[in-house]
Amino acid sequence: MSANAETQTPQQPVKKSGKRKRLLLLLTLLFIIIAVAIGIYWFLVLRHFEETDDAYVAGNQIQIMSQVSGSVTKVWADNTDFVKEGDVLVTLDPTDARQAFEKAKTALASSVRQTHQLMINSKQLQANIEVQKIALAKAQSDYNRRVPLGNANLIGREELQHARDAVTSAQAQLDVAIQQYNANQAMILGTKLEDQPAVQQAATEVRNAWLALERTRIISPMTGYVSRRAVQPGAQISPTTPLMAVVPATNMWVDANFKETQIANMRIGQPVTITTDIYGDDVKYTGKVVGLDMGTGSAFSLLPAQNATGNWIKVVQRLPVRIELDQKQLEQYPLRIGLSTLVSVNTTNRDGQVLANKVRSTPVAVSTAREISLAPVNKLIDDIVKANAG
């Protein structure tokens, strides 16, 4: 039995060595299959996606400033407050504006009365011309009757001279009356009272004063959230003083900074998937490429890089790509300006344009909150004109 055992002992390592070779072969084949599968997956799928985490949420920041100078009496909104379009944000002291408005109304009433008097004078001066014409005709008639009598020596020369002087005087008075009438007409230009230049100018001053009074109430031009409030009650502000900012929660987008080696296949309209740090992988935003910027970030910086130097080092540049977000998703999962995102662009479809070639036909944004209707002040002006026109 010992002899049989001695002859079988060397066969065990041979069997183990064969198993090890087969295992290594299987692992090698498995790795090759996985590598090929990954290669195929990259060729068919992954190579059509460009990804970057150098991407941040951007949005509109509406800087609130006053349109008139004044002293702040009330501040109606603070940081993080929600405001609607047309809500009052800041109130200025209206005393000076109200005084200017009252002064403008008084000036309009005075201008209407003066202009109305000029129009009345025009009728009086026209009547005076008729009177002077009659006087001239009478003087001329008297003189004509006396000429034959003077030639026949039936009246004295002095009386004839007096008649001649009366004609000259009447003619001079008629000329003066005509000049006065023309001068008065030049003042009123033969137009209606409300269309007179002096009245129009005074009415414009009333409108300006009324607008200044209305603008002591600083309102929000858009619906959004208040940020960066700097104004305080009692502060003296001017039209260039930043008061606060209003940030709309809608119409946000992502500025993704892709390397210049990633943008060759990017086109306008390509679909984008966005993941944010604030919500993580639980929320996937969908969007699309709406445009590629016309310059890299360094090219538009305050101090552009100077590459014409001896120690130049090449650095891969990044180009901002603007990505539009789904507004419904924004309403459900609101974002904030400056948040970090991970962006993946599907570049499979390359039928779109690299650069936009259509002119925008609609406004990017519209706000009518600060448009002030002049109907109330125009009615007030009409009432003042009627009340002082006599």
Swiss-Prot record:
Keyword hit for Repressor: no
Keyword Cell inner membrane: yes
Any one Gene Ontology BP term: response to toxic substance
Coiled coil: 120-180
Membrane side Periplasmic: residue ranges: 46-390
Record GO terms (molecular function): bile acid transmembrane transporter activity; identical protein binding; xenobiotic transmembrane transporter activity
Known function: Part of the tripartite efflux system EmrAB-TolC, which confers resistance to antibiotics such as CCCP, FCCP, 2,4-dinitrophenol and nalidixic acid. EmrA is a drug-binding protein that provides a physical link between EmrB and TolC.
Protein name: Multidrug export protein EmrA
